[in-house]
Amino acid sequence: YSVYYLAGNHDKRFKAFISHCGIFNFESMYGETEELFFINHDYGGNYWDKSNAIAQRSYANSPHKFVDRWDTPIMIITGEYDFRIPYTQSLQAFTAARLKGVDSRLVEFENEGHQVFKPQNSIVWNREFFGWLDKYLK
């Protein structure tokens, strides 16, 4: 969540972003997870309850609402077996970045969940992560 939010609210403080399994769109996330306790707790409720000021404030700050300000390169890492934050959140963010013309890269692990555990995938993760930083921070 925080990386996607910062991408639209950073006033040129960052040269590049990397998001690993982040939440991009609070509204679609509400319907994509089975962990309703956490999402109701974190967001204050559902997005369609207009009388719930806490929830409405949360959803008003969903990162997808700030894509119009995205202008900084972003690499997005996700695992297709992530059942807490579905990989479709990453796909939405990647699609938005591409449509905005923001330099972006999607690294998708088809056999990983929220964390990268397989040794060969850890090597790829590190190579991609530090390669992105080298590209934009040197």
Segments predicted by a language model, with ranges:
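Active-site-proximal cap/loop segments of hydrolase catalytic domains
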Residues: 1-138
